[in-house]
Amino acid sequence: YLLEAIRAQKDYCPRVIFTSSIAVFGVPFPDPIPDTHHRTPLSSYGTQKAIGELLLADYSRRGILQGIGLRLPTICIRPGLPNKAASSFFSGILREPLNGKEAVLPVSDDVRHWHASPRAAVGFFLHAATIDLELVGRNCNLTLPGLCASVKEQIEALERAAGKDTVSLIRREPDPFIEKLVYSWPQSFEAEKARSLGFKA
């Protein structure tokens, strides 16, 4: 509806920043994933994001809007309360212990993932709002830079920052469903195009 509403306006070609996700990629994929890798979503969420990317590119190509899509890494540490998203433990195992609360870890320590901080996410959007879109080109959906870290590395960083007592608040409760799901997620990216355009994690 939004894109069609924009199309219906005369002499109106706004910049549209679309929040996409690394969930547009599913197994099998190389590690790291290059910018040229095709979308292979394996979830409804990832499929919806991929559809959004295609629509954004098409409406941009037709001159209806000036689009740029940002494939965000998983944002960590997210503020607020834990939620039911399968990825929520990445923030929870840091945020909750730092607040003196117990956190559940449903996966193995060797799970790796692609992260960016809330501050970096804000920077991504500010940069996207002002970047010269001629430099972005026709492929207007970008995989953004981030930090590839394992759960073990997260816990080690927590211990360095807050001590062993804080780490002891992490309760290991293996969940085979979540672990299988998380192992199907991408772990690292080259993100060369976004870096060359000035996006920084």
Question: Language-model features: where?
Answer:
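Conserved active-site helix of classical SDR/Rossmann-fold NAD(P)-dependent CH-OH oxidoreductases
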Residues: 3, 50-57, 90-91, 95, ...
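Active-site Tyr-X1-5-Lys
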Residues: 27-29, 42-68, 73, 98
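A conserved pocket-lining segment of Rossmann-fold NAD(P)-dependent short-chain dehydrogenase/reductase
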Residues: 72-83, 92-116
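Short-chain dehydrogenase/reductase
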Residues: 31, 37, 42-50, 83-91, ...
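Conserved Rossmann-fold NAD(P)-dependent oxidoreductase catalytic core, especially the SDR/UDP-sugar
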Residues: 1-42
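Conserved C-terminal active-site "lid" loop/helix of NAD(P)H-dependent oxidoreductases
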Residues: 118, 174-199
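Mid/C-terminal beta-alpha module of Rossmann-like enzyme folds, strongest
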Residues: 97, 124-179
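Glycine/proline-rich active-site loop of Rossmann-fold NAD(P)-dependent oxidoreductases
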Residues: 50, 77-91, 118, 128-141
